[in-house]
């Protein structure tokens, strides 16, 4: 059996509520910029939810031909834009000689929800003959991967993971394993989501998952007293990851190394986490075991931290159960306090934050931290970014259905 290959991050691309590229998104995260505001994409008057993290000043026609864009749902459009940025950042040349060894693995939690709404209205109002022939290709969650591979010409391993809010992290984890075992030299991977639609807001509201707070400064406040649900966000976070051998051969810039991946199932409830965060705790331990490290080795954890009453508390319990005494010295921040919850895309964005935290020795804060929940008594990096020398960082994603996914990143050393 061949030895596992080392896997490094060489490119990044982002669309988020706090920036339309990686540079802007990261700078605003370190500044503690709040990307949450009143929803403009749809009329929210009939709903109890009125806030979300929308993209700002973004026009898809600046990136994709209008005719082509009309044949894609927004979640696919976002993936293409972020993937192009990541590949350009990595200076990855996809050509006839390399295409078979470069794959794509991008997930979406809910896929083309807006496409579904439009097609359903056409069906009800005008009959089945008026439904677009592009309806199914626009709807299905794997189409972000499909369209990105077509757009970039990547012909290697190709797939899509759907694990609700753990989608982005699971996608990167699966791509990591593909490269680690030598099935590809590089993978374009992450998550994408465009959930700010009537049906998504109505559905998540009905499940009482969303915050009904209309104050943009307090609606999303992870680990704080009075938190009442998550605030939805949209965007995409895409990485180029590749074998160290490949990266060094072409002189690529390396942000960080991926060294561990853990994924588990709660087998407990369709939306609620297992008591005491048991499933999340096992995923964190599995990721550390995969990386060959102990809790004391980790300096920073980008928490799932969605600002739900039960979810935040259970994640804190999971962290304490996993890290023990080391939890007292761990920096734990929720960047969702700034971006909102990007569902399937959140793991991609937060992998970028984790890697850049290592590279720049800075940790983005948990903003809106003014009324701490005494039961969530971790160092959540309140309100202001902090300097921190990081060797290992971890990123948690926990999804409906009991999906738990964790990645471990390491400062790169040749």
UniProtKB/Swiss-Prot annotation:
Residues annotated as the enzyme's active site: 165, 304, 341
Gene Ontology CC terms = cytosol
Query: Carries keyword Transferase?
Result: yes
Disulfide-bonded cysteine pairs: these are none
In this record, what's one Pfam family? Answer: ketoacyl-synt
Q: Which Enzyme Commission number(s) are listed?
A: 2.3.1.179
The UniProt keyword set, sorted, is: Acyltransferase, Fatty acid biosynthesis, Fatty acid metabolism, Lipid biosynthesis, Lipid metabolism, Transferase
Q: Which GO terms describe its molecular function?
A: 3-oxoacyl-[acyl-carrier-protein] synthase activity
Spell out the family assignment given in the record's similarity comment.
Answer: Belongs to the thiolase-like superfamily. Beta-ketoacyl-ACP synthases family.
State the protein's name.
3-oxoacyl-[acyl-carrier-protein] synthase 2
Organism of provenance: Staphylococcus aureus (strain N315)
Gene name in the database record? fabF
